[in-house]
């Protein structure tokens, strides 16, 4: 597999120019809670679920002090519940909630208490977000960035990043691999990936010359066929020496099979139960990026998106601009033999993608400091075009598509807070979707 070195294109879409290009999609937006959202580092993974049994949608979001809140939408009554605070966030933007529904109907919220431990909160009753939730400590394994999903047979996986130095006190601070935990009994008991495979970690490295041994998964997406698509970048101190998150570098892609716990490349190469540095550089490298801070932006950004068209993956990601201009947005497409990468827009923070049909995906994106969510379409994993603008009263910082969504509760928009301090929580919570006829 070959990676593509980035080359600038002459003509790309301008974020400003696309705001006037209205497509056919007609979104409605509901403000479910006003002036409640704190800054959050949440990834576009597991924000909410639709429960067909009771015809309700459940969403999660981070409020003041990064405390976890849930709300429910009753599709029969067309009403939203008041926010229910269910867990403490310990005043850290990393401690945001992620939500899945266990096979027994209970809602589960996972939080990685920044570099300390992985916690789970369980709803007191199945198919309901009401009441006082029960909290469980899954492990004290220096966990951050939980990414949960539930397989067809009800097995629960939670991927997370480990800060190894906080466990042994000696490993360089920029060694931070990915691991996971697994439950086969609706979250009652857990085993780690090391317990199950014997591998020290699932994705990672320990001895790169550039000290880029931190893994930042931008998005993890489980498909209907069970495959889990993953896009990620590296971080670390660079050649100057060990330092957490001084630089970012490169884009990588893999997919994971929960049935045998093996990872695979886009070409189908079986990499076994662990991805190490040799694997990722030989088989998973999508785009090679310079070890710099363009316009003082860590690049590629922490957030990326992954989708597939007829089984072929595509990725969205962005970087700062060396000349000080707007952010540069890239689309990488697997053509069956290698990766092709092109610049498709400027000035956007791509937040989430949603499958529209066999050939088309919708992209949700924002512009820094501005309200509204802009949407775009990616067709055949290659062709980018503007779609519409979804109006919001205030800027939006995070977007997640609800699992198995039912309109009008399709996408969760967490509003941007006015301050990085999570004691300040003045962003709105919006839910967007199409009007049901």
Residue ranges of each PLM-predicted region?
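Secretory targeting and sorting signals
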Residues: 1-19
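Extracellular, repeat-based ectodomains that mediate carbohydrate processing or recognition
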Residues: 20-437
